[in-house]
């Protein structure tokens, strides 16, 4: 037996053929590879949606129709909004959750690896169906990403492109629902010994709350989409305007739509919360209040949907206005936590910290204009104007894109075993930051001056030309900022040095920084003891470990008592 074992271990390791590599990735159930697939696919959708935005901005730079006609413009903003929210932002959450969450709780994988794989394929093919509507003769859907009735009816949107939009989103939505079931089960049932709920990293907490929100919001969207398809193809009349169907659609859609904004915000808040303590050299300020604020946002986000419907005159304005003001309070608490962590910290502005700081500035602007829009008298004046477009992009782009790039630069060594180039990262950040604010800051003024959203053209006499031209210049700078990032990824993959340590930043706090870069197939060779919410810091800096230790659970104490 000893000889056989020696011979077995002496066999040379076979290099994997390209064909086998492709099959391995297509059939993988490894949460890290599935996370890679989510992030790569969603970033590809981000690039496609960005090109659509640049075409629209090029059209709006000057009065008159230059590039696209009215219907093509409608198709562009419909697909742009759909792609960015449902095919980029939402699956990017799933990508980061797959990559990082099992590592942070000390789990070898997610609870249902095959369901995880199915979730990705549902998202991919749902997204391809939506994008495939570009190839049909009648063109893609042109009714806006919230598909208001009666515009979404067969009479007003007769092409097959609208049906592909509906069924593609339903399919991708089922993938999101199944993925959230997986994340919830993993967090509740697969934590490492010692990893109590109140020792979990904030990103994992936010993944938990986001998954709960998905299970409340996405089934409503899926049901509404399937009923809409029944209206279009089987003659049911649920969303018929004569039966009040137009308002019914708005209620159903926004009951999904507003939680969706927090579905694509909370996990990215979590990413920022992971980055700031590492580059402040301090534990997160107010760990418990951060969790409480996230719980409050989760609860409040399902009772504010009708602030999107103030202009209908058919909703209770005082209630929805008050609840919309109220949701700003826990968000403000988070800001105190983030700035409190940075205060008196030993700050260093490596690229991930730059993105986190850029997020704080951008999201603060978006939050302040959100408080303005929560007031019905003010909302009546700027609803469906570029003021709303600017607010929405400050909130969503300011959160999702800044935090996504921050997460990429922060966890890239954990994903790939190589560090992205810092100089290129800083060029990337500053070009994107300047381009973003140049694009969207002026749109607040355009909206206040009365420029409606979703118009393909305007008159020179309207006085919108100068600000639109400036916004378009900013948009192209914003688009160009992606080039240094893509070059950085290529350069790092080709020439980057291998990371030899578990924690290349030196001050990582959560459990993913206690395993190799990249981790082995089942994540950990050995698990360190978890005695606080910063197990990696405790392991690598034992002199400072447990400066504010939490009491250990009774069952752990009992396990160590001599029998």
UniProtKB/Swiss-Prot annotation:
Biased composition annotated in UniProt, kind: Basic and acidic residues: 552-563
Catalyzed reactions per annotation: 4 Fe(II)-[cytochrome c] + O2 + 8 H(+)(in) = 4 Fe(III)-[cytochrome c] + 2 H2O + 4 H(+)(out)
Source taxon at top rank: Bacteria
Keyword Cell division: no
One biological process term in Gene Ontology: respiratory electron transport chain
Record: residues binding Fe(II)-heme a: 80, 393
Spans traversing the lipid bilayer: 34-54, 76-96, 117-137, 164-184, 208-228, 252-272, 284-304, 309-329, 353-373, 392-412, 427-447, 470-490
Cofactor binding comment, as recorded: Binds 1 copper B ion per subunit.
Subcellular location: Cell membrane
Cited function: Cytochrome c oxidase is the component of the respiratory chain that catalyzes the reduction of oxygen to water. Subunits 1-3 form the functional core of the enzyme complex. CO I is the catalytic subunit of the enzyme. Electrons originating in cytochrome c are transferred via the copper A center of subunit 2 and heme A of subunit 1 to the bimetallic center formed by heme A3 and copper B.
Protein family (similarity comment): Belongs to the heme-copper respiratory oxidase family.
Name listed for the protein in its UniProt record: Putative cytochrome c oxidase subunit 1-beta
Lineage: Bacteria, Bacillati, Actinomycetota, Actinomycetes, Kitasatosporales
This protein's encoding gene: ctaD2
């Amino acid at each position: 037996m000893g000889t056989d074992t020696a011979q077995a271990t002496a066999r040379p390791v076979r290099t994997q053929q390209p064909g086998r590599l492709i099959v391995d990735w297509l059939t993988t159930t490894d949460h890290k590879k599935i996370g890679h697939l989510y992030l790569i696919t969603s970033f590809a959708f981000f690039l496609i949606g960005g090109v659509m935005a640049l075409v629209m901005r090029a059209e709006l730079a000057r009065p008159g129709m230059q590039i696209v006609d009215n219907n093509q413009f409608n198709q562009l903003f419909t697909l742009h909004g759909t792609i960015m929210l449902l095919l980029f932002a939402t699956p990017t959450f799933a990508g980061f959750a797959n990559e990082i969450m099992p590592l942070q709780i000390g789990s070898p994988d997610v609870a249902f690896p095959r369901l995880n794989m199915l979730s990705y394929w549902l998202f991919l093919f749902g997204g391809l169906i939506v994008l495939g509507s570009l190839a049909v003769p009648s063109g893609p859907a042109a009714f806006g990403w919230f598909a208001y009735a009666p515009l979404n009816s067969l009479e007003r949107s007769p092409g097959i492109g609208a049906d592909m939009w509906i069924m593609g989103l339903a399919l991708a939505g089922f993938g999101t629902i199944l993925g959230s079931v997986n994340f919830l089960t993993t967090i509740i049932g697969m934590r490492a010994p010692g990893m109590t709920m109140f020792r979990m990293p904030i990103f994992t907490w936010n993944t938990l709350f986001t998954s709960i929100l998905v299970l409340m919001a996405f089934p409503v969207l899926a049901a509404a989409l399937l009923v809409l398809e029944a209206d279009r193809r089987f003659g049911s009349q649920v969303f018929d305007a004569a039966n009040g169907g137009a308002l019914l659609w708005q209620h159903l859609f926004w009951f999904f739509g507003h939680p969706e904004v927090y579905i694509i915000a909370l996990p990215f808040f979590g990413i920022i919360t992971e980055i700031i303590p590492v580059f402040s050299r301090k534990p997160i300020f107010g760990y418990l209040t951060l969790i409480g604020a996230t719980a409050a946002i989760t609860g409040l986000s399902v009772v504010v949907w009708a602030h999107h419907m103030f202009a209908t005159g058919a909703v209770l304005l005082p209630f929805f206005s008050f609840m919309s003001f109220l949701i700003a309070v826990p968000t403000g608490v988070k800001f105190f936590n983030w700035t409190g962590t940075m205060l008196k910290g030993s700050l260093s502005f490596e690229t991930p910290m730059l993105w986190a700081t850029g997020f704080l500035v951008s999201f603060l602007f978006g939050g302040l204009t959100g408080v303005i829009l929560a007031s019905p008298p003010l909302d009546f004046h700027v609803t469906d104007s570029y003021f709303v477009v600017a607010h929405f992009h400050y909130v969503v782009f300011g959160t999702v894109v800044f935090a996504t790039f921050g997460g990429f630069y922060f966890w890239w060594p954990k994903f790939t075993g190589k560090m992205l180039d810092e100089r290129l990262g800083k060029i990337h950040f500053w070009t994107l930051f300047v381009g973003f604010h140049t694009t969207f800051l002026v749109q607040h003024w355009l909206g206040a001056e009365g420029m409606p959203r979703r118009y393909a053209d305007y008159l020179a006499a309207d006085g919108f030309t100068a600000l639109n031209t400036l916004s378009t210049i900013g948009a192209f700078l914003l688009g160009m900022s992606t080039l240094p990032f893509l070059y950085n990824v290529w350069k790092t993959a080709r020439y980057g040095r291998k990371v030899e340590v578990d924690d290349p930043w030196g001050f990582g706090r959560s459990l993913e920084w206690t395993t190799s870069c990249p981790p082995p197939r089942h994540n950990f060779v050995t698990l360190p003891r978890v005695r606080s919410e910063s197990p990696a810091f405790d392991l690598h800096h034992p002199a400072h470990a447990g400066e504010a230790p939490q009491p250990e659970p009774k069952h752990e104490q009992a396990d160590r008592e001599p029998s």
